[in-house]
Each structure stands twice: as C-alpha cells, then as structure tokens.
C-alpha cells in the first residue's frame, strides 16, 4: 500500500483521538464517570425504591450519564485498538487489515462528529422531552392542508430520530387538513433538536384545491417548548384557569381516538391555551393538559427573561409573511431556511422528515 495512503490513515486516527480527548474534557468525562458509580450504588440500595420519585430521578440521571460515559469509553477503546492494530499491520505489510481499519475510521468519525454536535445542547432544558404546537395560518383550506403536511413531517422526523410521539390534540379543517395539532415528543435531547423549528413555515405550490391549478402561498406556525418535570416548581393559581370539556374533533385513524372527554385549559392572565383529547379518560386528558400548561408557562417566563419573547410570541400570533423561518417552494423543488440559507432541492425527502441539514445548521449558527 502506498505511503501517502498509509500516512492519511495514521493522521485520521491521530486526529480522531485528539478530538475524542477534547470531548472527554468538554463533557466532564471523569466527573460523570464518578457520578455514575455513585448513582449505581444508590440504585442498588433497596431502600431507594421506598421513594419512587427519587428512584425515577436517579434512573433518568443514570441514563443521561451513561449516554456520555459509555460512548466515550467505547470510542477511546476503539481508537486505541485501531491505532495499535494499524501499527502492527503496517510493520507486517498486512494490506487487508489496514483496509479494514480504514473502513472502520468512517464509523468512528461519525461518532465523534455526532458527539461534537451534541455539545451544542447547552440550554438548561435541551435534554428534556418537548411539545410541538402546529397552527394553520393565512391561506384557508390550503393552510390547513399545509398544517397536516407539517404534522406528518414532524412525526416522520421523530421516527427517524427514535423519539416516541403522541398526538395530544388534532382539530380538523373545515374542508381538508387540520386547523391545529399538538404533539408530545419523548426522547433524549428532543427539545434540543427541535427548538429551532419554532417559527412560521411558508408553502408555495400549485394547489390541489384550485381547479385552475393556480399557484398558492400559505402559512403555518410551529411552536416548540420543553416538558417541565416535577423537579421544577411551577405555581398555577386555579382561579386563573378556565377549563372546558368538549367532544374530540380529530381526524381519527392512527393518530388519535374520538372521545367525549377532550379538555381545553385557558390560562387567563397570559391567554395561553392548551388542549388534550388523546385519551378516553377526561381525568388523564386534564392531567396531560396541565403538564402542557406548566411547560408553556415555564417557557413563557424564560423567553420573557431572555428578552426573546417578541420574536417567539409574534410567530405564534402573526402567522404571515413577516415571521418566516423556512420557505417550501414545491413547484421549483426548493426548500430554503431563511436564517441559515441552507437550501435543499429534494423536497419530498424533507417532507418525509429529513430535517437534519436544517436543524444542524441552525444549531451550529446559534439560531
């Protein structure tokens, strides 16, 4: 095997080892390793299960710690082993082994790049589960159909990422599509991945609802907010709430069950409205709606404190030209993020949930 190729493999392994060592420092590998041992010992104590809430918190912490510790441990072992094997194979002129190591470096590079990407999740709630609210805006029936396309897009994206999803509320459009929907997303860094999707999404296409085949523009808004767990105290005065019950009006099928026990809660001081209709039990729907409300109130307060409420709340209330984050021009095969200038021509792939190019660019640019 030529010397240039051998040197390239050696340099790649050295570069990956250096980046992995940097990750161990950035991600506090030593501290997390020690804490993982402590958590394991605590979970091995039978008395911890007398306090289910504490046991649950420890279980979540263990899972989070293992994600970093086990991945970095294996990466270090793989890189060290590959470097040692490479030197032996090079001395013996074993081209077959060297080619296998060269192939393995691609997988190790992908792991390093993924962990470097996850370093961008520095927000206090990035690791949390989240909710996605979808609201049809300007454009009538076309906008309702667009909202249903976005619902499908995000469900497909979450499926690709291995996230668990549940459609909590889905209101049908008068002719087609949906007026609104709320999704709960459960998975590691669900909010971190999805938070930059908040904003208005614009669709331009030849409308299937126009017999003349005219080109139509419509809008739908996306609002993503983290689920607040019991460790964060959110006080809600019952006097500030209006609770309405109604018959579910969703599209049915695989997403949602028709019930007579849907719940809508309005927080009067802020005007925040949450709805849940996925369960046949009114009690469970109300409990889920309260979780959504507390999460919304937490996010609302955070945005106020960070002086970012203007842009975010405008995106919720003014679903029109002025607050777009992404433009989907289907008849020109072009989807463009207006914040990062990332542009994709394979529109169907994006609508089928391949949002990673947009999300990664927005996180890297600190959108």
Curated annotation (Swiss-Prot):
GO terms for molecular function: translation release factor activity, codon specific. The keyword Membrane does not apply. The keyword Transferase does not apply. Pfam families: PCRF (PF03462), RF-1 (PF00472). The modification N5-methylglutamine is found at residue 254. Keywords: Cytoplasm, Methylation, Protein biosynthesis. Gene3D superfamilies: 3.30.160.20, 3.30.70.1660, Release factor. InterPro entries: PCRF, Pep_chain_release_fac_I, Pep_chain_release_fac_I_sf, PrfB. GO terms for cellular component: cytoplasm. Peptide chain release factor 2 directs the termination of translation in response to the peptide chain termination codons UGA and UAA. Belongs to the prokaryotic/mitochondrial release factor family. This is Peptide chain release factor 2.
């Amino acid at each position: 095997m030529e010397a240039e190729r051998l040197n390239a493999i050696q340099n790649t392994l050295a570069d990956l080892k250096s980046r992995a060592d940097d990750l161990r420092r950035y991600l506090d590998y030593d501290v997390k390793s020690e804490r993982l041992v402590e958590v394991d010992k605590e979970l091995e104590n039978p008395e911890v299960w007398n306090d289910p809430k504490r046991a649950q918190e420890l279980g979540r912490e263990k899972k989070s710690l293992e994600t970093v510790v086990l991945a970095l441990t294996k990466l270090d072992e793989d890189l060290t082993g590959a470097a040692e094997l490479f030197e032996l194979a090079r001395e013996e002129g074993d081209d077959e082994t060297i080619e296998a190591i060269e192939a393995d470096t691609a997988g190790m590079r992908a792991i390093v790049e993924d962990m470097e990407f996850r370093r961008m999740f520095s927000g206090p709630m990035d690791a949390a589960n989240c909710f996605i609210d979808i609201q049809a805006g300007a454009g009538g029936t076309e906008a309702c159909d667009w909202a249903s396309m976005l619902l499908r897009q995000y469900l497909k994206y979450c499926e690709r990422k291995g996230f668990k999803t549940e459609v909590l509320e889905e209101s049908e459009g008068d002719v087609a599509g949906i007026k609104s929907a709320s999704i709960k997303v459960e998975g590691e860094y669900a909010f971190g991945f999805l938070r930059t999707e908040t904003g208005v999404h614009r669709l331009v296409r030849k409308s299937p609802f126009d017999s003349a085949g005219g080109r139509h523009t419509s809008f739908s808004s996306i609002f993503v907010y983290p689920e607040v767990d019991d460790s964060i105290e959110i006080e809600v005065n019952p006097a500030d709430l209006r609770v309405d019950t109604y018959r579910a009006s969703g599209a049915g099928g695989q997403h949602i069950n028709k019930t007579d026990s849907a719940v809508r809660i309005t927080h009067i001081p802020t005007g925040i409205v949450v709805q849940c209709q996925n369960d046949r039990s009114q009690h469970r729907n109300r409990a889920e709606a309260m979780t959504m409300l507390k999460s919304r109130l937490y996010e609302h307060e955070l945005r106020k404190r960070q002086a970012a409420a203007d842009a975010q709340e405008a995106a919720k209330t003014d679903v029109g030209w002025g607050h777009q984050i992404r433009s989907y021009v289907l008849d020109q095969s072009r989807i463009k993020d207006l914040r990062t200038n990332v542009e994709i021509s394979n529109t169907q792939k994006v609508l089928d949930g391949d949002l990673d190019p947009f999300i990664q660019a927005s996180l890297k640019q600190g959108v």
